Amino acid sequence: MSVWQGRSRRKPTGGLYRPARKKRKYEMGREPIETHVAEEAFKIKKVRTRGGNLKVKVVRTGFANVLDPETGTCKKVKIITVRENKANIHYVRRNVITKGAIIETEIGLAKVTSRPGQDGTVNAILIKE
């Protein structure tokens, strides 16, 4: 079953809108890609978007680009686990990375600043404990 992002047929009053046309292909969406922490190989998924462009989505990753704000340097470090995720409390148990998630890395805790399901990479900024 596909995801449709058009207007609902139901009015706030409970009545129905009578559609003047059918559903269109450009109103379709997709299920979200949930980026997982994994020891296995880095896995991405390429998706064709509007205009024939490509969007790279991270499916599995074990590394993140972490910026140290004190020194201004960026390092590629191994992700150990997801500590906190405000998007969904169950994402912590499943090790799903989203923007704003707190991840535990080799050099300490870091907050994810990129959108792995949209950007194709995991960028984070180191936080002080």
From Swiss-Prot:
One annotated Gene Ontology cellular component of this protein: cytosolic small ribosomal subunit
GO biological process: maturation of SSU-rRNA from tricistronic rRNA transcript (SSU-rRNA, 5.8S rRNA, LSU-rRNA); translation
CDD domains hit by this protein: Ribosomal_S8e
Any Pfam family: Ribosomal_S8e
InterPro entries the record matches: Ribosomal_eS8 (IPR001047), Ribosomal_eS8_CS (IPR018283), Ribosomal_protein_eS8_arc (IPR020919), Ribosomal_Se8/biogenesis_NSA2 (IPR022309)
Keywords: Ribonucleoprotein, Ribosomal protein
Keyword Ribonucleoprotein: yes
Signal peptide: none
PROSITE patterns assigned: RIBOSOMAL_S8E
One annotated GO molecular function: structural constituent of ribosome
Region Disordered: start-end pairs: 1-29
Family affiliation: Belongs to the eukaryotic ribosomal protein eS8 family.
Protein name stated in the entry: Small ribosomal subunit protein eS8
Organism: Methanocaldococcus jannaschii (strain ATCC 43067 / DSM 2661 / JAL-1 / JCM 10045 / NBRC 100440)
Taxon lineage: Archaea, Methanobacteriati, Methanobacteriota, Methanomada group, Methanococci
